[in-house]
């Protein structure tokens, strides 16, 4: 049986109107369980200030972003289920949903799925890699009952 453990941290000043822990657990498990049987992931929901600080500190980009992924690199001799951390900026997710005319919960789900795939080693730097990652994201989103996030 798969065991995907979620540590949800809410660091937003206003925590009203956020998806609940069950939502995040479903989205995370749906993204990870096809690839790993056991994993632990922290999802930290933040405001724009913290997102901007982390984005600058780790990527030298001085603005907030929707999701940051920090994969955990396990020492070779120590098999741990820790997969990594996702930092998701509430305000950016909400703004993007409006600008892209997407249902808010669908966009939250997409950010979790997208970030989880980064933790699993997928990226979208090269065009072929982007196509593969987007295809997997779309499949997971449709499994969850959401539309293709790239349409």
From Swiss-Prot:
Gene3D superfamilies reported in the protein's UniProt record:
Metalloproteases ('zincins'), catalytic domain
Note one Pfam family from the annotation. Answer: YbeY
Q: What class of enzyme is it?
A: hydrolase
Q: Which residues bind Zn(2+)?
A: 114, 118, 124
> Which compartments is it annotated to reside in?
Cytoplasm
Alphabetized, the UniProt keywords read: Cytoplasm, Endonuclease, Hydrolase, Metal-binding, Nuclease, Ribosome biogenesis, rRNA processing, Zinc
What processes does the entry annotate via GO biological process terms?
rRNA processing
Query: Could you tell me what the cofactor note in this record states?
Result: Binds 1 zinc ion.
Q: Report the EC code(s) recorded for this entry.
A: 3.1.-.-
GO cellular component terms listed in the entry, alphabetical order: cytoplasm
Q: Which GO terms describe its molecular function?
A: metalloendopeptidase activity; RNA endonuclease activity; zinc ion binding
Q: Which PANTHER family match?
A: ENDORIBONUCLEASE YBEY, CHLOROPLASTIC
Family statement: Belongs to the endoribonuclease YbeY family.
Name assigned to this protein: Endoribonuclease YbeY
């Amino acid at each position: 049986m798969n065991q995907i453990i979620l540590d949800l941290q809410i660091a937003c000043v206003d925590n009203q109107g956020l998806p609940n822990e069950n939502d995040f657990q479903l989205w995370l498990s749906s993204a990870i369980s096809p690839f790993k049987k056991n994993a632990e992931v922290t999802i930290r929901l933040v405001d724009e200030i913290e997102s901007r600080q982390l984005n600058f500190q780790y990527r030298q980009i001085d603005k907030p972003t929707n999701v940051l992924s920090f994969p955990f690199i396990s020492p070779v001799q120590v098999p741990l289920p820790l997969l990594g951390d996702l930092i998701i900026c509430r305000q950016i997710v909400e703004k993007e949903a409006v600008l892209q005319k997407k249902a808010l919960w669908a966009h939250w789900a997409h950010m979790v799925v997208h970030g989880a795939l980064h933790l699993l080693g997928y990226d979208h730097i090269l065009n072929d890699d982007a196509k593969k990652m987007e295809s997997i994201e779309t499949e997971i989103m449709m499994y969850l009952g959401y539309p293709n996030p790239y349409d």
